[in-house]
């Protein structure tokens, strides 16, 4: 039995009447969740050990129930986005040999001649996730149980208010929301989610429960929460993963939620958590302090010690489906970075680098500086061909101020 199943069963036995899942239209206690999982597992008796099962129900509660039910059958849940087209689902099923699909509590077989008959499944896999690229077919990857258990422990160290409720309003097909949900249920907490992100409705749910709360969000959600101007004293920790928040956003959060700690994470679906910034205590341009036991390498460093970031830790994934995976391998993030005093500084994506007269220019670094100018709403740096320099960088911005070349150069 997987450890997450053991953890869940412990809290089912200890606190059967405690709320486990809260969505706008569905609330389940730990006891009720247990019954739902058992009933679902009885419907899926055909699922065998290590067989892949696509979860594609429109309601996230059903997908959570089915996630654990598939585990009870020894299968591997595959986390689909219910908004994917039928064509995309068909391509994923064929490409990654997903033998079963579950939708509306119905198990459908997709058995066919598999290109992965001889595939070696990594140890202790808890699910298959998919990268969220905007083009092409999402890449399937294995998430192992140990990596998340280690991550849970690191999270517990950062929560300082004995939080009883974990909130993640994003779709469960996104690693952050699924992680937060399994984290909550593995530690006996209440999980609040949403079918579609609605900040006002979310505030009402949190206020109704009135428990110390940690909320896992991405920066666009942070901005929408700020826009509501709704104070919520129950929110004790805000954990943001994605783009670095601006100083202005941080100050707005402090004004709206003065009792809350803001913890910014840098990481990827593959590498999990790499660094964290607690209440913006790290240097201004960094993405935080490296987590303990995260090893780093900077490949192909230039004269400024900037190189391509690769990481290794107990929190990383177990590789892509269908590719040979080596335990303990280094994970390349695709970011140019440097490290100073255990703090990580990102200067740009490998694919975005502009070379101006032989000098590396990193648009992300420039955009970050421009966004710190008061009155700037958005900033974008692009490269265009140039006869003399090969490329030059062009800044596009919007806001209430007008910038000039000398001002930017001085800044």
Curated annotation (Swiss-Prot):
EC category name: ligase
An individual GO BP term: fatty acid metabolic process
Stretches assigned to coiled coil: none
Record-linked Pfam families: AMP-binding
One MF term in the entry's GO annotations: medium-chain fatty acid-CoA ligase activity
EC number in record: 6.2.1.-
InterPro entries hit by this protein: AMP-bd_C_sf, AMP-binding_CS, AMP-dep_synth/lig_dom, ANL_N_sf
Keyword terms, alphabetized: Fatty acid metabolism, Ligase, Lipid metabolism
Domain of life: Bacteria
PROSITE patterns cross-referenced by the UniProt entry: AMP_BINDING (PS00455)
Family: Belongs to the ATP-dependent AMP-binding enzyme family.
Protein name: Putative long chain fatty acid-CoA ligase VraA
Gene name for this UniProt entry: vraA
